[in-house]
Curated annotation (Swiss-Prot):
Catalytic reactions of this protein: N(6)-[(R)-lipoyl]-L-lysyl-[glycine-cleavage complex H protein] + glycine + H(+) = N(6)-[(R)-S(8)-aminomethyldihydrolipoyl]-L-lysyl-[glycine-cleavage complex H protein] + CO2
Subunit structure, as described in the record: The glycine cleavage system is composed of four proteins: P, T, L and H. In this organism, the P 'protein' is a heterodimer of two subunits.
Gene name linked to the record: gcvPB
Protein name: Probable glycine dehydrogenase (decarboxylating) subunit 2
Homology family: Belongs to the GcvP family. C-terminal subunit subfamily.
């Protein structure tokens, strides 16, 4: 459906209108033809909109008012940890000594920034129970891939070239099998048992001499803690494999439990989730990777070291997998995460987990009478419901999500994990008040009653948004990803 009341920026163009004027040329003019080969020079002008600065401001301000973010409302996306990002993070990230430096500066001139990076690494080592950390990876999936490449390098250095398989649970994040594939591994699925945890017998069945690693989130994507994690680690390690920790759900165990103490060999973190770097909208993110001692030689170079003369980057890493990102990671997000960790302290981080778990369990118990609860036990930071009973009445989980838009809420994650029918995954985080949770819960209960009494209201939702229902089939099969200038009218 076309958005009728908000013209595209291309549709408000007026030939000859400008938004910015360049100063008069005060140097000798250089022709493009004298600098670039003809293959690199446009034959026709780019079809850019011709608009004033005021046009631009009003257009994008109007669009921004339709966006939904953590600062504007509740954002209960499961497995995304959409917590409030403290604004002190932004103030610190804008310090001139952080914002105005360049990665190609001499190390002697950026010792303060390097000290922050080193201290952040030390904090993450303590939080995760790993032996060292690299800040290079730029996001969660990037961290996954980096960690898997480290595992691959480790096995190959030990002559284990036949370890070509990575095991992932059927409840795993979709990035896990994708990262394994990109890293050159074959993915093997291990089933969950009736309690929503990894089936140990199935794990024993699939682990063998070809196993490179088991990728695991703990608590898992169902919001359940893998209580047999020590036995799982023993199974994998006895077979010569490594245990990989997907840090997407670390918010559930901060200062309560550490991946390193559970037997994990590699961990990636999402600083843009757990440690309040703003996320959503494409980035930037930060996905540091921590490892145990036997994987340190393969970490991407350079690594940051502290000596009696200060901080420096060590490039002398003959066994390293190489670089995984230009320079040293997304520094601005690292500054925000460091600020958050120092502001909270160990007791504050422990409270983060306590309130995140409390909020999730409160919501789960209040909603359980109205939606199916696949796993009736205490959850951690998130939980899953099922819309199976609503589906029997002709209303899909997608319809429920659309109906929530009418009340100003961003919908939860739906249809994931894949092993729960009509899945609704909710993560409230620790930063939401009871009043906010109750408001959302009340609307979820209202929707459940509407399904029983007046299902058409839910099936046809949303009713109050500017854009209603999209043709999802056409959007998937024939997406319109760029503006096409209308053909000139023939007269």
């Amino acid at each position: 459906m076309k958005n009728q009341d908000q013209a595209l920026i291309f549709e408000v163009t007026k030939e000859g209108r400008v938004g910015y004027s360049l100063p008069k040329l005060d140097v000798e003019e250089v022709k493009l033809e004298d600098v670039f080969e003809s293959d690199y020079i446009r034959v026709e002008d780019a079809e850019l909109p011709e608009v004033s600065e005021l046009d631009i401001m009003r257009h994008y301000t109007a669009l921004s008012n339709r966006n939904h973010g953590v600062d504007s409302g509740f954002y209960p996306l499961g497995s995304c940890t959409m917590k409030y990002n403290p604004k002190i993070n932004e103030s610190v990230a804008r310090f001139a000594g952080f914002a105005n430096i360049h990665p190609l500066q001499d190390e002697k001139t950026v010792q303060g920034a390097m000290e922050l990076m080193y201290d952040l690494q030390e904090h993450l080592i303590e939080i995760t129970g790993m032996d060292t950390v690299t800040l290079q990876p730029a996001a969660g999936a990037h961290g996954e891939w980096t960690g898997l490449m480290l595992i691959r390098a480790y096995h190959e250095a030990n002559g284990d070239f036949n370890r070509t398989k990575v095991i992932v649970p059927d409840s795993a994040h979709g990035t896990n099998p994708a990262s394994a594939t990109v890293a050159g591994f074959e993915t093997i699925t291990v089933k969950s048992n009736e309690n929503g945890l990894v089936d140990l017998e199935d794990l024993k069945r699939v682990v063998n001499e070809e196993t490179a690693a088991l990728m695991l989130t703990n608590p898992n994507t169902l919001g359940l803690f893998e209580e047999n994690i020590l036995e799982m680690a023993e199974i994998v390690h006895n077979a010569g494999g490594k245990l990989y920790y997907d840090g997407a759900n670390l918010n559930a165990v901060l200062s309560q439990a550490r991946p390193g103490d559970m037997g994990f060999d590699v961990v990636h973190l999402n600083l843009h989730k757990t440690f309040t770097g703003p996320h959503g909208g494409g980035g930037p993110g930060s996905g540091p990777v921590g490892v145990k001692a036997d994987l340190i030689p393969y970490l991407p170079k350079p690594i940051l070291e502290k000596t009696e003369n200060g901080y420096h980057f060590n490039y002398d890493r003959p066994e390293a997998i190489g670089r995984v990102k230009p320079f040293y990671g997304n520094f601005g997000i690292n500054v925000r995460a460091y600020t958050y960790i120092r502001s909270m302290g160990p007791d504050g981080l422990r409270a983060v987990t306590e309130y995140a778990v409390l909020n999730a369990n409160y919501m789960m118990r209040r909603l359980a009478p109205f939606y199916d609860l696949p796993f009736n036990r205490h959850c951690k930071h998130e939980f899953v419901l099922s819309g199976r009973r609503q589906k029997k009445l002709g209303v899909r989980t997608l319809d429920i999500a659309k109906r929530l838009l009418d009340f100003g809420y961003h919908p939860p994650t739906i249809y994931f994990p894949l092993n729960v029918e009509e899945c609704i995954m909710i993560e409230p985080t620790e930063t939401e008040s009871k009043e906010t949770l109750d408001g959302f819960i009340d609307k979820m209960i209202q929707i459940a009653k509407e399904v029983e009494e007046n299902p058409e209201v839910v099936q046809e939702a949303p009713h109050t948004t500017v854009i209603k229902r999209l043709d999802e089939t056409m959007a998937a099969r024939k997406p319109v990803l760029r503006y096409a200038k209308p053909a000139p009218v023939q007269v």
